[in-house]
Structure formats: structure tokens, C-alpha cells
């Protein structure tokens, strides 16, 4: 009686099995890889690395064992073949250069022979003496056949003169030029040394006629003396002095002579001083 109600109840007694199956499914789909499969993947990675390393080693060995690095007989033969080919090319180039040089030399020889045949001096007779002048008189062929003795005499004639005559002519021209230069220099006027002098002419007192004093100073006339501007400069106590400019030639007029000539006018001139002296 107590268990009959269980017959009518709808209870899922196998639900845990379905839960376990669902959990295992999702674990396989999203969960960690099981131990055996993880080991298989690690072994696959190691094998792949080993294969990659072997491939790299083979590539490096193939690169180092090139044509230049071959040490066997085959490598030596290939190197010799390359060197022989380069030597053959150089030989051909040198042969072409030699042929070009030979052709150029043959052309030069032909041109020289043609020039020698066409030049008039080649047809002229050889000189009798070893010492010859730069140029000789060449006679026409008919005249040479008529008088061979005259040709020998003409060969001794120097149309341009000897070296001694040339030296004499050069010496004469040099002397002529020196003489002309000396004459030209003599005709050129010589430079005259001149000086500019500023004189201070002092009177006796303030009653001295300064116009008369200046007239007396300017009355001094000498060869090589030229008077210039003048002015009156006050000294003191109403006394003024005459300051006058003049230009003299040094060879003709001296300062002492000039002072003596001015101080001759004793009535007006007390003293003469040189205020400035400049060479021109």
C-alpha cells in the first residue's frame, strides 16, 4: 500500500547517467586534451622540429659546397677551365691590339715614304762636306746637268750669313737702342726739388706801415723764388706780423739767402722766422 503510489509517480531515475554523458561530451569538445592525445601532439612537434633542422643543415651544406668551394678533382677542373677561358679572351684582345698597331705602323711608313718621294730636298744631291748650313741653294735639274761644277760652288754659298755676322748685327742693334734710350733720357726734363716755406716777418712797433713792409718783402726777386699768399697776424699790444707763403727751388734758393735779402729792409723789418717748411 505504501509503495503503490510510486508506480504512478514519474521519476527519472537514470538522469545521472545522462548528466555524466553530457559532461563528458562537453569536456571532450571544450575541455583539456586527454593525456595520450597531448603526448601524441608533443611527439609530432618534436618530429617536425627535427625535420626542419635536417632541412636547414642540408641547405647550408649545399650552399657551402658551391663551385668556388669544391675541393675535389671536379672543382679543380672547373676552376682551371674558367681560368683558361679568361686567358683565351685576353689573348684574343691582345692579338687585336697588336694587329691595330701593325696597321698603324704600316700606314705611317707608307706616308713617310710618300713624303720623302714628294719632297724636293730628297731629289737634291747629297752635300760634299759634313758641316752644312741650314739651307742650300737648289738649282733646276737642267742647269745641274749642264754645269755640275757650278752646283758644287753654289753649295758653298751661305745665303743667310754666318753666325759671326749675326752676332755683329745683334750687337749693332743693341748699341743703337742703348744710344736712343740715352738720348731720350737726356731730353726728358729732370725733376726739380722744391720746398714750401711759411715766413713770419715781424715789424719794429705798431707804427710800422705793414703795407710798405709787405711791398718790400715781395720786392725780393730771385731765380727759383715764387711768392704766394700773405696775411697779417696780431701779436700783441697792437702789433701785427706779416705771415707770407713762398715756394723755392732747393738748388737755387736757400733759407739763409732769403732771410738776408728780407732783413736788408732794416727800417721796416725787425726779424724773419721760418714758421713752416715742407718739401714738395
Swiss-Prot record:
Entry-linked SUPFAM superfamilies:
eEF-1beta-like (SSF54984)
Q: Show the ranges annotated as biased composition (Low complexity).
A: 139-148
Tell me what organism the protein belongs to.
Answer: Oryctolagus cuniculus (Rabbit)
Query: Which residue windows are coiled coil?
Result: none
- Where do Acidic residues bias regions lie? 149-168
Q: Which residues carry this modification: Phosphoserine?
A: 37, 60, 86, 106, 119, 133, 162
List the protein's name: Elongation factor 1-delta
Q: Where is the composition biased (Polar residues)?
A: 116-132
Looking at the record's lineage, which domain of life comes first? Eukaryota
Amino acid at each position: 500500500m505504501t509503495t503503490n503510489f510510486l508506480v504512478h509517480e514519474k521519476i527519472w531515475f537514470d538522469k545521472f547517467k545522462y548528466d555524466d554523458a553530457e559532461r563528458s561530451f562537453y569536456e571532450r569538445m571544450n575541455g583539456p586534451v586527454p593525456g595520450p592525445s597531448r603526448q601524441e601532439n608533443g611527439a609530432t612537434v618534436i618530429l617536425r622540429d627535427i625535420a626542419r633542422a635536417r632541412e636547414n643543415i642540408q641547405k647550408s651544406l649545399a650552399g657551402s659546397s658551391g663551385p668556388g668551394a669544391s675541393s675535389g678533382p671536379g672543382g679543380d677542373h672547373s676552376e682551371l677551365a674558367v681560368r683558361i677561358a679568361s686567358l683565351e679572351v685576353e689573348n684574343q684582345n691582345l692579338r687585336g691590339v697588336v694587329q691595330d698597331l701593325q696597321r698603324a705602323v704600316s700606314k705611317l711608313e707608307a706616308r713617310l715614304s710618300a713624303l720623302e718621294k714628294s719632297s724636293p730636298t730628297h731629289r737634291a744631291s747629297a752635300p760634299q762636306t759634313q758641316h752644312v748650313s741650314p739651307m742650300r741653294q737648289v738649282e733646276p735639274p737642267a742647269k745641274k746637268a749642264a754645269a755640275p761644277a757650278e752646283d758644287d760652288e753654289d753649295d758653298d754659298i751661305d745665303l743667310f750669313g754666318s753666325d759671326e755676322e749675326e752676332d755683329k748685327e745683334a750687337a749693332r742693334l743693341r748699341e743703337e737702342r742703348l744710344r736712343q734710350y740715352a738720348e731720350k733720357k737726356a731730353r726728358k726734363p729732370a725733376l726739380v726739388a722744391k720746398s714750401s716755406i711759411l715766413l713770419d716777418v715781424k715789424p719794429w712797433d705798431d707804427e710800422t706801415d705793414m703795407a710798405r713792409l709787405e711791398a718790400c718783402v715781395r720786392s725780393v726777386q730771385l731765380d727759383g723764388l715764387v711768392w704766394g699768399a700773405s696775411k697779417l697776424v696780431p701779436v700783441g699790444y697792437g702789433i701785427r706780423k706779416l705771415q707770407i707763403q713762398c715756394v723755392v727751388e732747393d738748388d737755387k734758393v736757400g733759407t739763409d739767402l732769403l732771410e738776408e735779402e728780407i732783413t736788408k729792409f732794416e727800417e721796416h723789418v725787425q726779424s724773419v722766422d721760418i714758421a713752416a717748411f715742407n718739401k714738395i
